[in-house]
Structure formats: C-alpha cells, structure tokens
A protein has these predicted regions:
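An amphipathic, aromatic/His-enriched active-site/gating alpha helix that lines ligand/cofactor pockets
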Residues: 14-34, 41-54, 95-98, 123-155
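Non-catalytic surface loops within mature trypsin-like serine protease
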Residues: 75-77, 122, 163
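Short amphipathic alpha-helical segments
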Residues: 10-21, 78-102
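Short, well-ordered beta-strand segments in beta-rich or mixed alpha/beta enzyme
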Residues: 2-8, 30-42, 68-73, 106-132
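General small-molecule cofactor/ligand-binding pocket signal
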Residues: 104-106, 160
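Surface-exposed beta-loop interaction hotspot
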Residues: 46-84
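Short, low-order "capping/linker" segments at domain edges
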Residues: 61-66, 79, 115, 155-166
Length: 166
C-alpha cells in the first residue's frame, strides 16, 4: 500500500528540503499560515517529523501547480471501519468535475484525523464545484439519518486550503 507523509513548517525551510530531494514525489503546499510538504511513496519518507498516512484511495496523478483542499475528518478509533466503508462506497463524482485533477483518501497511522485531499487546477474550480449539483448530490445525506452518525466523529471536521507550488 502506498504511504503519504505530511510535514509542516516555514516556506523557506520546506522549499529547501524539497529541492534537496527533487528525485522524490513531493509537493510543496503554501498558504498565509505557512507551508506543508506532501510526500507519496511506497517506502519510508525522508522527513524527520511527519504525519504518516496510508493512501486508501487514489485517483489522478498530480504533479504540477494548482490548488489543494485538505478536509481533515477526526474519527473515533472504534468507528474507523464504518467511516472507511462509507468512503470505499462513495459515488466518486468529484473526480469528473471540471478542474478536479485528483483525490486522495488518507488513513492516519496514529490518532490523527483522516484527510480527504482534492487537487484542482485552480481555486475557482473548487469554488465552482461547491456550488454545483454534483456537490449537492455528494453531500445530500449530510445531517440526515442516511448520513454518517455524528457519534463516529471525535471532533469537528475542518478544511485547509493551499496553493500547490511547482
């Protein structure tokens, strides 16, 4: 199974680290709060301190600049199977939306939130998707008896958005 590692820090430090490992599949994410390095590999990462995930689902090859949305979803340890089953059986419509270049469903190795990462050609494409019929369909069961029960969550989900640098 493919692994994914994410580490956070300053832009200067992480861009230098990325340059030192340009043979690796690494992406630099930036926003007004700082930066993150994202590393997908079938082996261990060169990061000294990173959050480790298993890639449960991967669609699209993302290797160029754009926009990424990281949806952090805290899930109770005892409810992980329920959560994962829901994502394994998802409709998979976001991948066919204009501007969507890929998606990753990331299972945390430690007690961190799951991450659903969607990669876009630009922020505008993500915003367009949020107001689309496909978005409504994908989220139609939220807050209903057909949706995931609130008890599976160990905290409130949150989004982080970044520009993806070259």
């Amino acid at each position: 199974m493919m692994n994914c590692y994410v580490t956070y820090g300053t832009y200067d430090y992480l861009s230098k680290l990325k340059e030192e490992h340009d043979e690796e599949s690494v992406m630099l994410f930036t926003n007004s709060d700082g930066a993150a390095l994202y590393h997908e590999t079938n082996s261990n990462s060169f990061f000294k301190n990173a959050k480790k995930y298993e890639v449960m689902d991967k669609k699209g090859d993302v290797t160029h600049p754009g926009f990424v949305v990281l949806n952090h979803i805290p899930v109770e340890e005892s409810e992980r199977a329920v959560f994962e089953d829901r994502f394994k059986n998802r409709a998979g419509k976001v991948e066919s939306e204009p501007g969507c270049e890929g998606i990753r469903i990331l299972r945390p190795i430690s007690n961190d939130p799951y991450i659903v990462a969607t990669f876009w050609d630009e922020e505008k494409s993500f915003k367009n998707w949020q107001t689309s019929e496909a978005y409504e369909t994908a989220h139609k069961n939220r807050h209903t008896s057909k949706g995931l029960p609130k008890t599976i969550f160990s905290g409130k989900p949150y989004l982080k958005t970044y520009q993806v640098e070259n």
